[in-house]
Design a protein with these regions (language model features):
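Terminal regions of secretory-pathway proteins
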Residues: 9-396, 414, 419-752
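Alpha-helical bundle segments that constitute or directly flank the non-heme di-iron/ferroxidase center
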Residues: 395-407
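A generic structural signal for short
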Residues: 2, 401, 576-577
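Hydrophobic faces of stable alpha-helices that mediate helix-helix packing
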Residues: 406-410, 585
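N-terminal secretory signal peptides that target proteins for export/translocation
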Residues: 1-8
């Protein structure tokens, strides 16, 4: 079944006044506009047809609300009409002040709401078709309307200068397209959105009826079966989540008290609910929640994004993080937050010397400002951690990864200070940051992605790293922005791998104990016990991950974010389904087609792609294979040979990582950039392995397997001593500013 069967088959032609540059997109003739703003009644957009004359399919019926009539062969949307819609929206929507932080969620969200309200007004008034909303409205030059008065400067007027160090907010990653890959910009799309009303309402069935409840899909398709993977360790989940939090965090209304949970929706009367409430309803016969008389889980929709130039169009959410791997988990996405994390001495990050008297390494700094944000505190004397990314305390294992890379930054800064004693704090910090980001990129593409995707997918999508020399693959035409299907579905693959309990192991690789995953969510307090950090890292390298399949642990389907003393929590799988639908993500089958995989019109045609029992379950709750949610179908697929993932998720994830590499002007392998490493420095970065990071940034661990994301094997993945020289170390002498003059000092410093 093709996308056009779901979308409307009949499209009216769009034409813009003026003849400067014309092109044809999806059969719609589009021409750029060159009209003075002050001309009364001038057309911003001309629709070929009298308006409201087409036959709309079910997904657009809700747009047909106006009684206006249009005569003649064309319909003109004037600048005056857009300004009138703007003034109407301003009566209801308050645009927040940017103050000194123009990337504040509240400010970006309020502008997005205003511009989207104008789009919705025009769509209803003129009865716009799907193609007119998606391809026509975005071509209107809103700088010639009153919208220009509120459009954030970072979306319309950015001046970039080539420099050695990347910005925290991701702006100017591309000099020609400064907002590409920047924080607080729209998610990109591989496929057009499928909204129930054509512009914003969550996706429904292709039959026009509602989809099965998200909780019904969760309990039917994704029960906890507890199968284990044969080779992958929990470390692959830990690194994957650390990467996910470098890439994606959608903007949503937050509870005013804890700043992390969604606004309360279920227990409020309709007139007091936040307009973004989109609750997850629980059936009365739910085997688990009925025990506690729970019939609703709080959930809120994402804010609409202001598009670059504040262009009009359908709702698209915004990403509060950047679209490139830039270590914002360590450093944050604003300069102001980065400053809060710094010591401003020796290029170091602030840390908490919890075990100074034991001679052990520091933990992350304590979160003393808004201490309840993202943290379940047993009492007022206990604190969670502060890091570059707000979700650092989401689960203890994630806090471990944040701690590891913060320690690595400080290790690098101290080493650089010894080699270059004339460097000031700023130079030391930025150089350590630059190297640390390169290490994160290298470990991700050299160790994580090959295990996740497999050799064939890596080669097909150009993800294989070079072993020598520079890689000159930067393409200024590639947008590294995060793909909506990646953020809302594909890169949530790790939920299938989550264990029921997280294990601690000794330095001798012996099991010590385990703790339920749900008891470690927003409760990282075990790390305040001396030596426990190392034990959890030993567990990450020795505990086998769950299998990649449709089975999801009850720790996150029934107990997610469980409150202290409670017997139930939320359902992460339902969240995934609800988020994908409200994003307007097309169904699983549409992405299979995009990736060159077979489309199935019948459930029985799916037997080669996933287990028969899973297909039988799908047929029991969905009306058509095209209705299956992307996340659900993606985790249920049979893995590709040599890969953890099935073909659909492998395709989407590989596409994203290809964009992130080819679209990043600061990518560590590139030549001829102000940020480029020397050939000698680049070869040093290529030496770095996750095993070395663990050896260098833990206290007592002295043996690790060469590839910690895979279970040890005495032949292909042996455990080796940290000090044996088998695991190479990065030689910071290649960063010496005066290498010849200080050669004798370097030999002493480095023990040569």
């Amino acid at each position: 079944m093709e996308m056009t069967r779901v979308m409307m088959p009949c499209v009216r032609w769009l034409t813009l006044l003026g003849l400067i540059s014309s092109n044809v997109v999806f059969g719609i003739q589009l021409q750029s506009l060159d009209v003075p703003f002050n001309g009364e009644g001038e057309c911003a957009l001309i629709l070929d047809g009298p308006g409201k004359s087409s036959n709309f399919d079910y997904s657009l019926n809700l747009l047909r609300g106006s009684s206006l009539n249009y005569d003649g062969p064309n319909t003109c949307i004037t600048f005056d009409a857009i300004n009138a819609a703007y003034l109407d929206a301003r009566k209801r929507i308050h645009v927040a002040s940017p103050d000194d932080a123009h990337f504040k969620n509240e400010y970006v969200a309020s502008v997005g709401e205003l511009v989207f309200d104008i789009s919705l007004n025009l769509a209803k008034t003129y009865g716009l078709s799907y193609q007119e909303i998606e391809k026509g409205l975005p071509l209107i030059d809103t700088s010639k309307t009153l919208i220009r008065d509120v459009c954030p400067a970072f979306l319309s007027n950015v001046e970039c200068r080539a420099g050695k160090y990347r910005r925290y907010d991701g702006l100017c990653t591309n000099l020609e397209h400064p907002t590409w890959g920047a924080s607080h910009t729209p998610f990109t799309r591989l496929l057009g959105p499928v909204y129930a009303d054509g512009i914003q309402a969550p996706r429904i069935s292709i039959t026009g009826r509602p989809l099965p409840l998200a909780r019904v899909v969760s309990r039917t398709i994704h029960p906890d079966e507890g199968y284990h993977d044969h080779a992958g360790t929990v470390m692959i989940i830990a690194w994957g989540q650390f990467m996910d939090h470098d890439y994606t965090l959608q903007g949503t209304p937050l509870d005013p008290l804890n700043k992390n949970d969604p606004e309360e929706c279920c227990n409020r009367p309709a007139h007091l609910k936040h307009p973004y409430c989109n609750e997850i309803y629980i059936p009365e016969d739910d085997f688990f929640y009925k025990l506690f008389k729970v019939n609703c889980i709080d959930f809120v929709r994402t804010f609409p994004a202001p598009r670059p130039g504040c262009r009009l169009g359908s709702k698209v959410p915004f990403n509060t993080l950047t679209g490139v791997l830039d270590g914002n988990t360590v450093y944050g996405v604003t300069e102001s937050h980065a400053k809060k994390l710094r010591m401003f001495e020796g290029g170091l990050l602030r840390m908490h010397p919890a075990f100074e008297h034991f001679g052990l390494k520091d933990l992350l700094p304590l979160k003393v400002e808004i201490p309840d944000e993202g943290c379940t505190r047993p009492n007022s004397s206990m604190y969670c951690f502060e890091a570059g990314e707000i979700r650092v305390n989401e689960q203890l294992v994630l806090a471990c990864m944040h701690t590891l890379m913060a320690r690595e930054h400080n290790r690098l800064a101290k080493g650089l200070a010894e080699i270059n004693p004339h460097w000031d704090d700023e130079t030391l910090f930025q150089e350590a940051r630059r190297i640390n980001i390169a290490i994160i990129q290298h470990v991700t593409y050299n160790e994580f992605l090959p295990i996740l995707l497999g050799k064939d997918v890596m080669e097909k999508f150009g993800l294989t790293l070079q072993k020598q020399g520079y890689w000159d693959g930067y393409d200024s035409n590639v947008n590294p922005g995060v793909i909506d299907a990646f953020a809302a579905a594909a890169f949530r693959f790790g939920h299938s791998l989550l264990p029921t309990a997280v294990e601690r192991w000794s330095k001798a690789h012996k099991f010590i104990s385990s703790k339920r995953l749900s008891d470690l969510i927003r409760r990282p307090y075990d790390l305040f016990r001396a030596g426990v950090f190392d034990e959890y890292f030993m567990g990450l390298m020795n505990q086998v991950a769950q299998a990649m399949d449709d089975s999801i642990t009850q720790e996150v389907t029934n107990h997610l974010f469980k409150k202290a003393g409670a017997k139930f929590g939320m359902d992460l799988v339902s969240f995934n389904m609800q988020r994908g639908r409200e994003f307007g993500l097309p169904g699983y089958m549409e992405y299979r087609k995009f990736c060159g995989l077979p489309w199935s019109d019948r459930f029985e045609d799916m037997f080669q792609s996933m287990p028969n029992e899973t297909i039988r379950k799908y047929s029991s709750i969905f009306e058509h294979p095209a209705d299956i949610d992307l996340w659900s179908g993606g985790v249920s697929e049979k893995p590709l040979p040599g890969s953890i993932l099935g073909p659909t998720f492998a395709c989407i994830i590989a596409t994203q990582f290809s964009y992130s590499r080819r679209g990043d002007r600061f990518w560590y392998e590139l030549p001829n950039q102000p940020s480029s490493f020397t050939p000698e420095q680049l070869q040093e970065i290529r030496k770095v392995r996750l095993a070395r990071l663990i050896c260098d940034n833990t206290d007592l661990i002295d043996t690790v397997q060469l590839y910690p994301m895979v279970l040890p094997d005495h032949e292909i993945n042996p455990r080796v001593p940290c000090k044996s020289g088998i695991i190479p170390s990065l030689d910071l002498s290649k960063w010496a500013h005066f290498p010849h003059e200080h050669a004798f000092q370097l030999n002493d410093i480095l023990g040569k």
